[in-house]
């Protein structure tokens, strides 16, 4: 991935609920001297005094509040780790507090508490905000930008001057740690359901996570295998954000000229139409003066025009490109999906919410300021939360989306996904697959179509850290509860680092053309 660090952090926020209604131990454990296979991350900084600390009692109270309120609000806190394991983890964290705790260190402890449950939508960003403050103040970070190919962590940008560590190199060690050890440490502070989802977040902002895991460094040693097979090591110096982007601009790496956030509808000829919807939320231009991310009219006009073009073109095949799509809201994506089927449908086979005290208060406030359509998802959610007992987990009867007849498309539908098809993009792909609307091509998504999501948040009393929790559990239309991304019907590998052609798109179009030719060949004469 292109390493543009501040925008990349938005990718982490994009790993959010499929439908919007809507991490590390203390440094004094001397990990290098113990046999712990996943030693504690170093603190972002170690102040000489405790002027920038939380008192021991404040830290303990925040941790206790965190655990108590998560049990009240999280739709299923113990889904992946049972209560006994959580109890032991919280006891371990509390035992580390034997005096004032540096704020940066405590924020990492909060990350560790949240990441322990292995649910991506249960998280805090307190330590990430510390790291971003370091970057914005001119602090230096290790400029490693990476992409995964299978289990291999590959560089996708130049990280230093000279010819060592060229893009496409497979990293084998960072600071003496094997990649598996780096990932194991990262898992302690990054909320992720699966290793694939963990890696996708590391791709988005590895320099930030290295800063949190290793602490400030002037340089780190990186061992690698170059694309040609030669092994090497290099000391990669830390850089300011400005110097890092200047280095990348001075040494550009070829890549497909594609922006996944653009909205594109294009006739490719030979009966194939291409549709890249972009995010399922309003763009900056579409939000207007109100700044409303759910202002849907601009997106509606785009979709109306796109399907009018498709109808006029006489296309028999439609390719929907969801690669790199950060997701958004189902009300947007339904404008597309409803034109591809002649049957009512629901985006999930099950949708349950926990009506915790914070969630009930949040939705009571929303209901007071908004007149919800009782038949809409938001209206049904509001009613279910209001009627449920405090802390109760209740099913929401999802409204069925009705087919849209205007310029409906009844040809062959194909969807292209990758590991960065997040949130509602993964949900749309699962919906198209489960309802037999489309053939899914590409690579497995990192995000999950059966997931804990629809997040809300509360704030801790002393640190002020925002704690994000999932209030809902949704199951994909097929009913599968497997903890896995959307698996394509036709797997397609991404292109190699340094390739400017869109290899995956070319492969997809070749498969569509082959299918068209096969159908033409077998079509009986009239």
Show which residues each predicted segment covers:
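Bacterial N-terminal signal peptides
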Residues: 6-16
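Boundary at the C-terminal end of the N-terminal hydrophobic targeting segment
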Residues: 18-23
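Flexible, low-complexity junctional segments that flank or bridge functional domains
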Residues: 29-318, 324-353, 361-369, 444, ...
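Short, surface-exposed connector motifs at secondary-structure boundaries
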Residues: 315-319, 408-414
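Low-complexity, serine/threonine/proline-enriched polar segments
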Residues: 353-390
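Alpha-helix-centered segments that form part of catalytic cores
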Residues: 376-411
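Extended, charge-rich low-complexity interaction segments
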Residues: 379-393, 471-487
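Extended C-terminal subregions enriched in glycine
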Residues: 412-434, 439-447
């Amino acid at each position: 991935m292109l390493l543009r660090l501040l925008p990349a952090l938005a990718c982490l926020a994009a790993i959010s609920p499929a439908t919007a209604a809507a991490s590390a131990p203390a440094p004094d454990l001397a990990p290098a001297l113990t046999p712990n296979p996943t030693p504690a991350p170093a603190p972002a900084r170690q102040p000489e005094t405790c002027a920038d600390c939380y008192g021991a009692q404040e830290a303990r109270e925040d941790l206790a509040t965190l655990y108590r309120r998560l049990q009240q609000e999280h739709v299923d806190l113990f889904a992946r780790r049972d209560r006994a394991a959580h109890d032991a983890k919280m006891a371990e964290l509390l035992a580390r507090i034997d005096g004032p705790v540096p704020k940066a260190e405590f924020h990492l402890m909060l990350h560790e508490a949240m990441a322990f449950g292995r649910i991506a939508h249960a998280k805090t960003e307190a330590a990430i905000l510390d790291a971003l403050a370091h970057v914005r103040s001119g602090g230096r970070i290790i400029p490693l930008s990476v992409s995964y190919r299978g289990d291999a962590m590959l560089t996708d940008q130049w990280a230093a001057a000279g010819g060592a560590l060229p893009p496409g190199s497979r990293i084998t060690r960072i600071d003496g740690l094997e990649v598996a050890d780096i990932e194991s440490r990262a898992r302690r502070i990054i909320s992720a359901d699966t290793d694939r989802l963990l890696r996708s977040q590391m791709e988005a902002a590895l320099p930030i996570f290295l800063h949190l895991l290793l602490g400030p460094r002037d340089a780190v040693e990186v061992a690698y295998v170059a694309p040609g097979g030669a092994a090497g090591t290099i000391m990669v110096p830390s850089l300011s954000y400005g110097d890092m982007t200047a280095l990348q601009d001075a040494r550009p790496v070829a890549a497909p000229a594609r922006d996944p956030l653009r909205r594109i509808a294009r006739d490719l000829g030979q009966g194939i139409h291409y549709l890249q919807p972009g995010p399922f939320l309003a763009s900056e231009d579409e939000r207007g003066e109100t700044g409303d991310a759910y202002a849907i009219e601009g997106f509606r006009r785009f979709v109306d025009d796109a399907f009018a073009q498709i109808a006029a073109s006489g296309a028999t095949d439609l390719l929907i490109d969801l690669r790199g799509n950060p997701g958004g809201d189902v009300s947007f994506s339904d404008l597309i999906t409803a034109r591809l089927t002649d049957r009512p449908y629901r985006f999930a086979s099950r949708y349950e919410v926990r009506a915790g005290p914070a969630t009930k208060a949040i939705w009571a406030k929303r209901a007071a300021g908004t007149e919800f359509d009782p038949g809409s998802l938001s209206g049904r959610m509001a009613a279910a939360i209001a009627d449920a007992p405090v802390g109760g987990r209740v099913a929401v009867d999802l409204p069925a989306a009705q087919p849209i007849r205007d310029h409906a498309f009844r040809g062959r539908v194909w969807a292209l996904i990758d590991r960065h098809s997040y949130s509602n993009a993964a949900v749309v792909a699962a919906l198209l697959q489960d309802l037999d609307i489309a053939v899914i091509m590409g690579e497995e998504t990192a995000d999950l179509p059966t997931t804990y999501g629809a997040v809300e948040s509360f704030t801790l009393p002393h640190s002020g850290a925002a704690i994000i929790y999932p209030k809902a559990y949704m199951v994909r239309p097929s009913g599968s509860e497997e903890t896995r991304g959307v698996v394509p019907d036709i797997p397609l590998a991404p292109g190699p680092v340094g390739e400017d052609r869109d290899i995956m798109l070319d492969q997809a179009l070749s498969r569509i053309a082959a299918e068209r030719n096969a159908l033409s060949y077998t079509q009986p004469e009239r």
